[in-house]
Every structure is written in structure tokens, then in C-alpha cells.
Curated annotation (Swiss-Prot):
GO terms for molecular function: ATP binding; protein serine kinase activity; protein serine/threonine kinase activity. Coiled coil: none annotated. This is Serine/threonine-protein kinase YabT. It comes from Bacillus subtilis (strain 168). SMART domains: S_TKc. Keywords: ATP-binding, Kinase, Nucleotide-binding, Phosphoprotein, Serine/threonine-protein kinase, Transferase. Residues 28-286 form the Protein kinase domain. ATP binds at L34, G35, K36, G37, A38, N39, G40, I41, V42, K55. The keyword Phosphoprotein applies. InterPro entries: Kinase-like_dom_sf, Prot_kinase_dom, Protein_kinase_ATP_BS.
């Protein structure tokens, strides 16, 4: 929820407003508001080089913290997770009679995660989560925990499909207290642990994102939250395939994102193998008997054309081809894009 100062600032920064940096002198023309949070507002802005996403805030410390996170992403060569960083500066807004801090970053275009899954199908959920775990692994190795990990902060770009994060406001140094979180994806809310910034905190959120992606809505916890989540996982065919990874993530058993990723990959491969039907052995062809000609008469052997295979055989082969193509595409996504 925004404070009063940010609410006033949002009213002042309308489409068409131009912001000029005090120190670097770069100019940004606001086109529309993309989102807002507890510590700032994000706009689509236009520059001489194209479009950027511009985050504006009256809290210079929060801007500095987020800039450090984006720079860390770049150093770790993990820009595929978060947006690329371009510029940071201060500016004076005459219409609001206030000084603001801002930073410019890559404008990431694409549908939000839940929209993408709704359009393309639930089979994309594990593929995208495996990609997310790859990015989280790099982030954690740099000493950062994403914190406020949720579908509203995840966009799918492409083709080829690639999951990206669009808000690093909750990213926290490992070992500290998580500074921003959303209850539904927070392990403290569900009674599974503390809000200490550590890899297992993010992995709990990944499990909740998978549950939310399947059930398509957030829900309130009951008086038995752990049993509630267990029932939701075991009661859904897709989630059940990955229940080992999901239960381990919920219980905080993983020490790294790579461990969860391995279990997800193993579960996906087992599910793909179970889908492939076993091809029946072909029946040996029976030779057509030739009638022995009677003596004194020449008997022509009648030619009998081979019977066409039944339609069910063609359907079987078509099904096998489709499954093989899907398996190859799944492997392509995992081994070439992750």
C-alpha cells in the first residue's frame, strides 16, 4: 500500500510528464503507469533510445538498494531473471513540489505468468518453474534472496518462452529479515518457518506459485494449513507428479535451488516416460498357400492384395509421433534455454 506522499506523487506524474535527471541529464517522458507498490511507482517512459521502465520514489534509500540488486544481476550475468539496469538519478517535480529518486531499467514485454499459463496450458508450469529455479540459483550464489516472489512479479517473454522478474523491491541480503512479502507466498503465514532471508524462503514461494498456477486463485488458510496444502497437491494430477519436490520445498528440506531443480527434472522425465506407449511387436506375415495344380490342367495362382492396416494402427503411430515431438520440445526447453 502506498503512503500519502507517493499517492500525491502518482497524481502529479501524468502521461506526458517529462523527468530530467539532475546529475546525468537524461530525459524521460512518461507514457503510462505500469504498476505501483509500497515504495514507488513504475512507468513506461520514452527516451531518445527507445522505451524503458522507470521506477520513481520519494525514498532514495529504497531506490539505491534496488539499483544495487540490479547491478548485482548484471555482474552475475543473470540479467535473464531481472531487468537490465540503465540509469539512476534524482529529479525535481515542479507539479508536486518535491524531489524524487528514480532508476531506468529494461522494459520487459509479455503476459504475466498466470495469463500465459491460462492461454498456453498447465503443462508449461513445470517448464517455467525449472527456468525460475535456474535464475534463483545464480541470485542466491550472489548472496541475495528475492523475497517477494509471486506471479504478479513474473512475466513470460518469447518465443522461446522465458520467465523474467519485473520487481526487485523485495530482494534482501541473505541472513537478514525479508523486507517485503505477500502473505500467500510467505512461509511464515502458513506456519512453515521464519522470514529469514535464505534460499529455502524463495523455494517455498516457488512451490506456492505452482499451486496457485494450477488452482488459478489465492485462498485463505484453514486451521490446519499444512494438511490443506497437502490435500491440494495430492488432489491434482499435475501437482501430484511433482509432489516430492513440492513437499520438500514447503518443509524447507532444500539447501539450494539446484536441489529442487534436479527433483523437478527427474519427476518430469518420469512423467514423460510413463506417457510413451510400448509399441507392440509386429506379427510375422503368413505366407499364402499356393494350390497344387491338378495334373493335365494349368491352374493360375490368384493374386491376393495385401490388406490395408487397420485405422487404429495409424492412430497409434500418430499418437506416438505427437508424444515424441512433445518430449523433444520439453528437452529443448530444459537443456538449451535453462
Amino acid at each position: 500500500m502506498m503512503n500519502d506522499a507517493l499517492t500525491s506523487l502518482a497524481c502529479s506524474l501524468k502521461p506526458g510528464t517529462t523527468i530530467k535527471g539532475k546529475w546525468n541529464g537524461n530525459t524521460y517522458t512518461l507514457r503510462k503507469q505500469l504498476g505501483k507498490g509500497a515504495n514507488g511507482i513504475v512507468y513506461l517512459a520514452e527516451t531518445s533510445d527507445g522505451h524503458v521502465a522507470l521506477k520513481v520514489s520519494d525514498d532514495s534509500l529504497s531506490i539505491t538498494s534496488e539499483v544495487n540488486v540490479l547491478k548485482s544481476f548484471s555482474k552475475a550475468q543473470s540479467v535473464t531473471m531481472g531487468p537490465s539496469f540503465f540509469d539512476t538519478d534524482d529529479a525535481y517535480i515542479p507539479s508536486a513540489n518535491t524531489k524524487v529518486s528514480f532508476y531506468a531499467m529494461e522494459y520487459i514485454k509479455g503476459p504475466l505468468l498466470l495469463k500465459y499459463v491460462s492461454d498456453k496450458g498447465a503443462e508449461w508450469i513445470p517448464v517455467l518453474m525449472i527456468q525460475l529455479l535456474s535464475s534463483l540459483s545464480v541470485l542466491h550464489q550472489q548472496g541475495w534472496i528475492f523475497g517477494d516472489l509471486k506471479p504478479d512479479n513474473l512475466i513470460v517473454t518469447g518465443p522461446p518462452a522465458r520467465i523474467r522478474c519485473i520487481d526487485v523491491g523485495g530482494t534482501t541480503k541473505e541472513g537478514r529479515a525479508i523486507k517485503e512479502y505477500t502473505e500467500f507466498y510467505d512461509r511464515g503465514y502458513w506456519g512453515y518457518g521464519t522470514r529469514k532471508a535464505e534460499p529455502s524462503y524463495d523455494l517455498f514461494a516457488v512451490a506456492m506459485i505452482m499451486i496457485n498456477s494450477v488452482h488459478k486463485k489465492e485462498f485463505k488458510k484453514t486451521n490446519q494449513p499444512k494438511e490443506q496444502l497437502r490435500s491440494l497437491i495430492e488432489g491434482n494430477p499435475l501437482l501430484q507428479k511433482y509432489k516430492k519436490a513440492l513437499f520438500s520445498a514447503l518443509n524447507g528440506d532444500y539447501q539450494s535451488a539446484d536441489e529442487m531443480k534436479k527433483d523437478m527434472l527427474d519427476a518430469g522425465q518420469k512423467a514423460a516416460q510413463r506417457k510413451q506407449p510400448i509399441k507392440a511387436s509386429p506379427q510375422p506375415a503368413t505366407r499364402q498357400r499356393q494350390q497344387k495344380p491338378r495334373q493335365g490342367k494349368i491352374t493360375k495362382t490368384r493374386y491376393t492384395p495385401k490388406q490395408k492396416p487397420a485405422k487404429s494402427g495409424g492412430l497409434f503411430e500418430t499418437t506416438l509421433i505427437v508424444i515424441s515431438v512433445l518430449a523433444l520440445y520439453f528437452a529443448y526447453i530444459i537443456f538449451f534455454l535453462i
